[in-house]
Amino acid sequence: MSFSVDVLANIAIELQRGIGHQDRFQRLITTLRQVLECDASALLRYDSRQFIPLAIDGLAKDVLGRRFALEGHPRLEAIARAGDVVRFPADSELPDPYDGLIPGQESLKVHACVGLPLFAGQNLIGALTLDGMQPDQFDVFSDEELRLIAALAAGALSNALLIEQLESQNMLPGDAAPFEAVKQTQMIGLSPGMTQLKKEIEIVAASDLNVLISGETGTGKELVAKAIHEASPRAVNPLVYLNCAALPESVAESELFGHVKGAFTGAISNRSGKFEMADNGTLFLDEIGELSLALQAKLLRVLQYGDIQRVGDDRSLRVDVRVLAATNRDLREEVLAGRFRADLFHRLSVFPLSVPPLRERGDDVILLAGYFCEQCRLRLGLSRVVLSAGARNLLQHYNFPGNVRELEHAIHRAVVLSRATRSGDEVILEAQHFAFPEVTLPPPEAAAVPVVKQNLREATEAFQRETIRQALAQNHHNWAACARMLETDVANLHRLAKRLGLKD
């Protein structure tokens, strides 16, 4: 089989039509799935010996949240090491990373698998994976044809990474660095709230402003602080963490500013505080609303003048520290109640960020669940950990008062429970493995009972016509995939569609 000029032109056009990289990547994957008639396709970015999904089609939504480390996925490692098209035989003993992750085919293993490494020059930047349920599904395509597809995908991904780096260099001071894959922190989520938060992080990271990060417990405020630091000019210097809620009043000042020998009972030597440790770097003060008013005053002085005094020392030390603070309280209300200094609040909240709770993040819960499933798989040495449809439905309708932290613990507990009731190293998480209280699932929609105005033949044809239409819509008008879904021969499906008036 040879790709026509029209097919290749259509792929190139789809890459130009998208608004933003994510949309272009999704258009590319959707188009390739139609052209190659595969059951699943994915575009992956390579970073730090792991593949990160950027766009998928035909795979469970939680795949977008998974991070595929090469050490745990020998097929992906083989793709990363190859310089060309990789075809895995149907009887390959290497496990497929997408086994159990094709909706409707959870119990079946992928049979046909092709991997296309993507390069920018000599640098591996990603991969394109094509999977099918039939062993010989991709035999009709030559390696040369697949190389053309890989070249188009590599160009799109390379341009996207280069644009991201150029945009980053425009915001950061200093000379431009040579091209390399853009580093990203593990901030998983595609919801509007998370997309906006990532944009704000990118903006404020390039500055040296203090940042106040607010959000409920368990939303990931520390992760936001880490993302800001890693994207800032201070990234080469330390990020120092201090939980203000865990500080006894008697040692809080010493923890922040240090002390000299003999300053108090037990001070047997000089000790640097967190501000000194973070010099030229970043200090993250978690739960800053827990600090006493006396310590708030001393912290304010550091922010104003940039100098500190160790406990028991009359000398001042100059420090250059960027402060990121986090709280789960409403500090405006704390100021009105007299429990937090207004001047410190204004110093800290030069650029406020708000982390949305998990219940407001829509499908992000499924992406995060996929991420934690993959973490559990690696930690416990399992071959696969997948979510059943019932488990996904449950997760999407639970309120998660404990936010992302509660989801993480729930996934870990469910994996342990499922593993205890199954033999082997494959784990499927069902709804009953989660102990969520008072989860109200929407009732299944009752099927409408039509008023019969047709004879049996007409009613049968109407049913067949609608069934085929729905199957085509679900498979992006891919007739081969539609036939597999309906469990019929593709030639018979074409003939039936013509008889029903669905094809010319």
Swiss-Prot record:
Annotated ATP binding sites: 215-222, 278-287
Pathway noted in the entry: Nitrogen metabolism; nitric oxide reduction
Modified residues (4-aspartylphosphate): D57
InterPro entries: AAA+_ATPase, GAF, GAF-like_dom_sf, Homeodomain-like_sf, NorR, P-loop_NTPase, Sigma_54_int, Sigma_54_int_dom_ATP-bd_1
DNA-binding region range list: 479-498
Molecular function GO terms recorded: ATP binding; ATP hydrolysis activity; DNA binding; DNA-binding transcription factor activity
Alphabetical keyword list: ATP-binding, DNA-binding, Nucleotide-binding, Phosphoprotein, Transcription, Transcription regulation
Gene3D superfamilies: 1.10.8.60, 3.30.450.40, Homeodomain-like, P-loop containing nucleotide triphosphate hydrolases
PROSITE patterns for the chain: SIGMA54_INTERACT_1 (PS00675), SIGMA54_INTERACT_2 (PS00676), SIGMA54_INTERACT_3 (PS00688), SIGMA54_INTERACT_4 (PS50045)
Disulfide bridge partners, by residue number: none
GO biological process assignments: phosphorelay signal transduction system
PANTHER family in UniProt: ANAEROBIC NITRIC OXIDE REDUCTASE TRANSCRIPTION REGULATOR NORR, TRANSCRIPTIONAL REGULATORY PROTEIN
Matching HAMAP family: NorR
Function: Required for the expression of anaerobic nitric oxide (NO) reductase, acts as a transcriptional activator for at least the norVW operon. Activation also requires sigma-54.
Name by which UniProt lists this protein: Anaerobic nitric oxide reductase transcription regulator NorR
Species per Swiss-Prot/TrEMBL record: Escherichia coli O1:K1 / APEC
